[in-house]
């Protein structure tokens, strides 16, 4: 594991990655607004010179219909911060006809993270996850490290690893 000089306190996302052999690097910044995804993207672009399309946000959606036994009605969509999630497409990828954005308090309670810091990794309750196919275009992508102001440079041979960590 490689960390930046200003490493954050351990988060469940970092703990989940530490249990794997997937290389990653932690990048932190001072969070100064309520526009977490955009702010993170702006900071990472300026500080590291990365493409904004390499930076992914984690969105929690609620699927319509009754979930299978033991399955949550919530799911996670990981998409570039430069795009808007098409909720209907995410629902279809998860086998549902419809979905909507989950209420913030429900997303926070279920994942164990605060809005603006929800990570696809190390969630309190593991949710089904779909990842935008554009992740395949990059050797590295950035996702939330599990708190506001913490991004992970995530290097993996497969974005599918995001949904299993």
Which residues does each PLM region occupy?
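N-terminal, charge-rich interaction modules
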Residues: 3-30
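Short, well-structured beta-strand/strand-turn elements
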Residues: 22-33, 96-106
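Short, surface-exposed beta-edge/turn micro-motifs
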Residues: 56-58, 71-75, 126-127, 138-140, ...
């Amino acid at each position: 594991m490689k960390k930046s000089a200003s490493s954050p306190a351990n988060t469940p996302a970092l703990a989940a990655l530490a249990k794997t052999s997937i290389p990653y690097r932690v990048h932190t910044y001072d969070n100064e607004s309520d526009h977490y995804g955009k702010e993170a993207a702006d900071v990472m672009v300026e500080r590291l010179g990365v493409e904004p399309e390499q930076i992914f946000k984690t969105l929690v959606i609620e699927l319509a219909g009754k979930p299978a036994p033991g399955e949550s009605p919530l799911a996670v969509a990981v998409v570039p911060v430069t795009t808007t999630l098409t909720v209907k497409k995410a629902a279809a990828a998860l086998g549902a006809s419809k979905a909507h954005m989950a209420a913030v308090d429900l997303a926070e309670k279920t994942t164990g993270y605060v809005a603006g810091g929800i990570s696809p990794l190390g969630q309190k309750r593991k949710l089904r996850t779909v990842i935008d196919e554009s992740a395949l275009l990059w050797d590295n992508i950035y996702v939330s490290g599990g708190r506001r102001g913490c991004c992970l440079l995530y290097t993996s041979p497969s974005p599918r690893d995001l949904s299993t960590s």
